[in-house]
């Protein structure tokens, strides 16, 4: 409604018309209201609303829709009545008390119907404003909008709205309201197809806009895509052409990361990038799309480099803040606990991105080497080295403070392990100094180290191929943790891990060390191996895979060098049954190597050579081998 400096003298005259008995008077009064009543003058608007009443407004709207009758109306006035009705309803809804009333809430289905039939009409913007204001004013309003299939109407119109328009802005705000009130799981069960369309439209806004609405789009995309309930939607989105919405999100992420924006928005961009990589894989970071859109094709590595650089910065900042909260800030306060929890969640996102980039770097040379040149690889390795150095400093700080338990520490070990699996010589001295500590780290739900060892196994397997690596492992003080890890992987405890290769990595690591025991001067009491021998016996009894049995027998043969039958039987919970199982395993593998030429000859030689060295200390094995 247009403001006017001479409102007061005209208001009383307007109210008299609105209270008149004839529709002509009320119509004239409403027209006057649109001329002089200020939209922010809530007091006057309340008086006007009370004077005209909701019944007449409802009848006016229905007449404009062709469903009702105004006594003075003519058919050719329907558009005028509709425009007037929507205008005054939109204006009245600016008063929260009016907007939250049931009389306004019941108009939502009618306004949605107007939108569906008047998509190009001048009243459309006021329809959107009415819906937003009434939905904001009360929960009943928001639920009526949702239950009246408001999302379906939004989805049908958003793709035709002008980029960055006020209608797009209102649509985004409406969707934010809905997501705060209704779970994404419920929404996607009812409106999966519509939600897919909406995400694609919002992704375009995120790409092309350069104002505050860009960040509203970013937040909305994160609210949808980073939700744990978004699995159905993610599946549906992957059926859409990636050249459109996925590319738009990449463009938007790059724009945020390479411009001067608030740190919080950069973090939001990283969260969105992590969601996209979870959907499309690491290649999303380097996928180059030719497009006729206003966005020029960018170098394939730009998004990758920007995401890694910002992740490195976030990790450095967040780990510094986490260290302060853990070791210096006042403890046992709600504010410290909340800040710590939030920053730890953010670190998880940055860690996840770096770990995915490490995976990409390890695969890209083989699969898409032409997309990343030598200069890009150099930049990536430099940034990864800097990132790993920062994480190692965080672990060193934790070690100095006597901290070994925590999911943040375990996540740090995981990312170190991921990188060292590809570059085992990176940060060599620091890794050597911290190896024992990293092997001792426990997650918050662990009673003893396990996952930290699993994360480091690829690196351990590589470094123990050389004597120096074996010495580093033997001297770090946590060799028992590696032995226990294999025991838990193959024993009756039934530990499970994502990567089944952990078993063979652990086997190879232990074999590498035992084979070099003389050069390493490894002196261990046989009791150290008792649990592992029991696990090897259990493994051999529960597998038909000959390669697994050969591996188990080889490790057993190497362990037997350190002990004897008598010493083992003196160990707690180590009995004749376990020893008999191990003897049967060795006997079977010796027989297999004689009969099967395809048997791994290296392992066969380890078993037979071991047997010749220690058979005299294990008298009962001769019964199994039948010598």
Residue ranges and their predicted role:
Residues 267, 277-401:
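Alpha-helical repeat/alpha-solenoid scaffolds of the HEAT/ARM/MIF4G superfamily
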Residues 408, 413-418:
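LRR N-terminal entry segment and analogous cap-like coil->beta motifs
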Residues 1-128, 132-156, 160-199, 206-219, ...:
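Elongated alpha-helical scaffolds that mediate protein-protein interactions in large eukaryotic proteins
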Residues 558-561, 606:
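Oxyanion-binding "anion nests"
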Residues 85-87, 127, 347-354, 412-414, ...:
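Well-ordered alpha-helical segments within folded domains of soluble proteins
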